[in-house]
């Protein structure tokens, strides 16, 4: 059975992610206590269910502490993927304020609402932190709902076994993605933004590609990043990781980082000798995907 566990900080978009799994034909369960997870899987096995997505209820901290060992047991007989959704505290406070909902871990009403909410968010972060290391982490701080759904759909194309390498472009002016394991700063490269013709375009467009591919520094940067990843990739595989996020950032996340993510991702996808290692590759463009349409 393919088991997809959705966890993360309340307000980070778990319901949106679960609906994306449901739209893809998965059996879905929301707000399931950890103590019932193994019983649920046994029941679904009896019903010949092949794909399930479960959003975990984090309100019982003692049960959450048992989740890593439960996942280890499930992985003996099933394919298990953990998706961890995160967002910065300011974004979470704003989302809870807009929806007027209480945080699941809110404490006493004697404190002010903002203090109670922030304390609840911090407490939940501490409870769930051990899960992040074995999860595919997505920072939804600047990510609209339609983009999160799209990212989940891309994730479903990925085999739930082996190491998944995510190449992600971003803009430093909006901050480094919290899920990044490796960060490469390419702001030192010539910027197409200063060309009036190229400014409204992106690194996906042919004129920008033609501009950047002729610059020796861009070619050198691309080669250096590839060589670094090729050197250390076997060590990340040996470490038993499920996910490795390589974030490449320029100023706005529109031209240089997008171009390099595409180029580097294409390079690794073309390496036939990596097939035996069960590697999966995803590429994302955070700022290009972050055009607001629907709030989480």
Curated annotation (Swiss-Prot):
Record keyword Nucleotide-binding present: yes
Binding, GTP: 57-60
GO molecular function: ATP binding; GTP binding
Family matches, as InterPro entries: P-loop_NTPase, RapZ-like, RapZ-like_N, RapZ_C
Annotated keywords: ATP-binding, GTP-binding, Nucleotide-binding
Pfam families reported for this sequence: PapZ_C, RapZ-like_N
Binding site for ATP: 8-15
Similarity comment: Belongs to the RapZ-like family.
Protein function: Displays ATPase and GTPase activities.
Protein name from the UniProt record: Nucleotide-binding protein Pnuc_1915
